[in-house]
């Protein structure tokens, strides 16, 4: 990847949406990291060219006006949260637990659940995923995670519920691993059938 500081973007050899599969042969998912743990810069993968770009607001690079991200944040490539099904038309969001990763990293992960939210009325599901490393080998569900660290999910939920301000993002509830897998498969099928719309 090439960092283009003048244009506030990271240029990838691959289109980070179209050229990477959502699911691997071992049923792990691929996650593209947009915002590392502890970061306050709002970046996203562009739907137009698949490169990572710093979002702009009122002519300036966007920063989160809240505490930094409590978790690595990114997308599952080759997916879309369908507008027709109440989503926002973007690739499926992922919160990725574990150590801090670099922006643009592509990581194999295992989904263990879903954080269900609404953002300005749009469905804004966020898949909860963990790495398949020694620390997380026994974490295969939200129950496993709670048994290991009861505060982790609450910390993540509270952050996403409040970082945009009061009464903007609504927490709907949690979904288990099977529900997360169903959401992922639906988003893959919709992407394969319709692709991503640019508006």
In which residue ranges do the predicted regions lie?
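Hydrophobic N-terminal alpha-helices or hydrophobic patches in metabolic proteins across all domains
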Residues: 1-199
